[in-house]
Each structure stands twice: as structure tokens, then as C-alpha cells.
Amino acid sequence: MTTALDQLKQYTTVVADTGDFQQLAQYKPQDATTNPSLILKAVQKDAYKPILEKTVRDHRDESADFIIDRLLIAFGTEILKLIPGRVSTEVDARLSFDTPRSIDKGRELIKLYEDAGIGRERILIKLASTWEGIRAAEVLQKEGIKCNMTLLFSLVQAAASAEAGAQLISPFVGRIYDWYKKQAGADWDEAKNGGANDPGVQSVRRIYTYYKTFGYNTEVMGASFRTTSQITELAGCDLLTISPDLLQKLQDSNDTVERKLSPDALHDKPTERVAIDEASFRFQLNDEAMATEKLAEGIRVFAADAVKLEKLIDSLR
């Protein structure tokens, strides 16, 4: 029998969402994604402590920020040895509202990769999908630095990212699901709100349909999954980035996976493009409580994990 994972790969580019690169080979993903939380989690494992310790030792007198950049590149370099495609490396979330510094950081990360002998075509620079992050992506893309817009929870963020020429977006599924489930409390009905009716799945489907309707080349990569059902409901999406735990569940399953998304079979096609000047962007984002709250929370969590990583580095000096 063909596994669910192998069936999914017939329709979608499968990406591994992890800093634990030793798990990559068994799932044979095309690309990989990392974020500050995943790197923090990885360096606390015995298998990866030597990478952290060596990076600190080699740059002991430099700032924690300087060392973190080298640590990100060290992980990215190891990941790229194990996959044929691209790795996503994230700009510090504390720069989410600072366009000039986000641009500078993106350039710095690319230079570090190129100094390590890795071409920029194999790197995606992850930026938060704030107005400022999207403007940074617009500049970087024109310089040939490909960007992955993360912490994306709404159509207006997706529309603005596409207009800016971003290479790829990462609309979050699980965190949207979490928000609606928490809001409903005891009234949540999993049977009614799961599967194709999952609010996170519906959000990605809407974004995918918008992009294909208006001919945007920006890739759609569903992210932040809680269940294999959320993944299989998006079979056919350009890419899906999946944690090792869920990759394993898909590999262990022989359930049939059918294509759910296709540019040739779009439903509920939009008739108008979203207005995305700065004022319209901010108003539409503000008008969507879920997107506003999850974007803010995501930035806080990633920023807090960056601080934890800095403290861990300082403790090793």
C-alpha cells in the first residue's frame, strides 16, 4: 500500500518544519522551515548542543545577536545537506515593525549563507507579515533575495504579500483553528467545525483561490498544523510544511489522500482584488480580531524565544 505521505507528495511539495534535522532523511522532504522556537528547542537536545557550543566558542566576544545569526546559518547549512530544495531562515521577530533593519538583517543572513558556499536560490528569508515586514520583502525580492512571509492569518496579509512580489507565504492553519475553538469554548463542535469546515483550512483555501484567480506567482505553503486531517484537506496546495510528528503519522497511514485544491478547479472565486494601501491594510487587519490577535501573539512568542536563546548563549560564554 502507498502511504498517505507518498500520496500527498503526488499533489503537494512536502516541507519539514523542524530544527531537528536528524529526522529529515526518513521523510524525504523537498524543503525545510525553521523558526526561533524550533531552533531554541533543538539546541537544548544533546544531539545539537555541540553546534551551539562551537558557535559560541568561535565568536565568544561577539554580541548574542551576532552569534544567533551564525547559529541559524549553522543549522540551515546542515539542513541543506539533507534536502534537495530550500531552507527558510527567520529574521528576528523583534524587527517585525522595523522595515530598514529587517532589510539589513535579510541581507546579512544571505551574505552569511553565501560566505558558507550556499547560493541564495536555496534560501528563503522569513519575515512576519506585518506592513513593515511586507515592505522589507518588497525590497529584498528586487535584490534577488527570496522571502517567506510568516505569521499570516488573513487574506489581506496574503494579498499584500503577493502584490509585494514575495516568493512564498505561510498561512497558519492550526493557530486559526486554536483561536476559533477557544472562542467557542464549550460550544465547540469538532464534527461540525473539522475537516473541510476547519476555519484554518478554509482560510488557506480562500487564499489559494484568490492567488490562482488573479494569477499571482507567490507560492502558498500551508503551515502550523494540529492534525493530519488539516493536512489532507489541503492536498494540492503548492506546499505544506509539516512537523516530524505529523509526517510520521502520515507515513504510518495507508488512508487514501485525494487532491482537494487545484488551480483548474477553483470554487467561490473572488471578483475583486483586495485593497492594500497601508491604511486599508491596517484597517482590514484590525477588523479581523483573530488575525490581529494571532499575529501579535506570534510575534511575542518568537521574540521571547529569541531572548531565551540569547540568555542561553550568554550562559555558555
Swiss-Prot record:
Keyword entries, A-Z: Cytoplasm, Pentose shunt, Schiff base, Transferase
Q: Record's family? A: Belongs to the transaldolase family. Type 1 subfamily.
Q: What does this protein do?
A: Transaldolase is important for the balance of metabolites in the pentose-phosphate pathway.
**Organism source for this protein?**
Burkholderia ambifaria (strain ATCC BAA-244 / DSM 16087 / CCUG 44356 / LMG 19182 / AMMD) (Burkholderia cepacia (strain AMMD))
From the broadest rank down, the organism's phylogenetic lineage runs: Bacteria, Pseudomonadati, Pseudomonadota, Betaproteobacteria, Burkholderiales
Pfam families from the entry?
TAL_FSA
Quote the subcellular location field of this record. Cytoplasm
Its pathway is: Carbohydrate degradation; pentose phosphate pathway; D-glyceraldehyde 3-phosphate and beta-D-fructose 6-phosphate from D-ribose 5-phosphate and D-xylulose 5-phosphate (non-oxidative stage): step 2/3
Q: What is its main location?
A: cytoplasm
| Biological process per Gene Ontology, one example term | carbohydrate metabolic process
What's a GO cellular component annotated to this UniProt protein? cytoplasm
User: Which Gene Ontology terms cover its molecular function?
Assistant: transaldolase activity
Catalytic activity field: D-sedoheptulose 7-phosphate + D-glyceraldehyde 3-phosphate = D-erythrose 4-phosphate + beta-D-fructose 6-phosphate
Q: Where is the signal peptide?
A: none
Q: Any idea what this protein is called?
A: Transaldolase
- The active site annotation covers 126
What EC identifiers does the entry list? Answer: 2.2.1.2
Q: Which PANTHER family match?
A: TRANSALDOLASE
Oligomer status and interactors: Homodimer.
Which InterPro entries does the record match to this protein?
Answer: Aldolase_TIM, TAL/FSA, Transaldolase_1, Transaldolase_AS
